[in-house]
A protein has these predicted regions:
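Carbohydrate-active catalytic/glycan-binding domains of CAZyme proteins
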Residues: 1-230
Length: 230
């Protein structure tokens, strides 16, 4: 089985877009079980001593079953301090995109589930560490990621039939629902189509992280500068 893990390193946003990254001193997540590995991290919160993440929790040897978990991790050691299972429906869930509401405790999760027929939104109760279904955003879409831009919301995702290759864009006037059902094909290539994380804002410029899948899923990450959306 392929084994994935999460690593932490110190950098500022400008380092990430200038290729000035020092990967010589990575703190790796200390897995709590040899049967579990973690992938697709999205940062929920950072304090002086801990990092809170939403991640894909993969149960090795389980015929592609994965859950969405909240991990609280020691920043210095990579040790998991707390773990909460949020979405577990006995199929493969991954890529837990975080959407923040108007208050600090208003959090929504949009996980990828390419085995489902829908892209669903869950409201996360951060006090009780529980999720409830909030809405259905679209028919199934892979690695859905949303960019607010000039008063509208643009959702980028690949299709289930070409999940590493065909990147589409949907639009809406609301971040959580109302996306049009006739997406625009943006890119069709194994290089740089599938999303690799949330959009980055650095010095008033927006960047789109994407995967290099020419040699297989997750073989590399590319950054694209977003110049305009129309």
């Amino acid at each position: 089985y392929k084994e994935w893990n999460v690593g932490f390193f110190n950098a500022i946003p400008e380092d990430l877009v200038s290729d000035n990254i020092d990967l010589s001193n990575i703190t790796w997540l200390r897995r709590d079980s040899k049967f579990h590995c973690y992938a697709d991290p999205f940062i929920l919160n950072v304090s002086d001593y801990t990092i809170d993440l939403l991640v894909e929790d993969i149960l090795l040897g389980s015929k592609n079953v994965a859950t969405i978990c909240h991990l609280s991790v020691d920043k210095c050691t990579g040790e998991i301090i707390e773990k909460y299972t949020l979405i577990d429906d006995n199929i493969h869930n991954s890529y837990p995109l975080i959407i923040r509401g108007d208050t600090l405790d208003e959090v929504y999760i949009v996980p990828e589930n390419s085995y489902s027929t829908e892209l669903n939104v869950y409201k996360y109760n951060t006090l009780l560490h529980s999720c409830e279904h909030f809405s259905t955003m679209l028919p199934v879409a892979v690695a859905a990621t949303i960019l607010p831009y000039n008063g509208a919301f643009y959702l980028f995702a690949t299709s289930r039939n070409a999940y590493n290759k065909d990147l589409y864009m949907w639009t809406s006037n609301n971040r959580l629902y109302g996306y049009d059902l006739s997406p625009i094909l943006i890119k069709s290539n194994l290089f740089g189509s599938r999303m690799a994380g949330d959009f980055m804002h650095v010095n008033n410029t927006v960047y789109r992280p994407a995967q290099d899948c020419l040699q297989g899923y997750g073989k590399g990450i590319i950054l694209y500068k977003v110049e305009d959306i129309s």
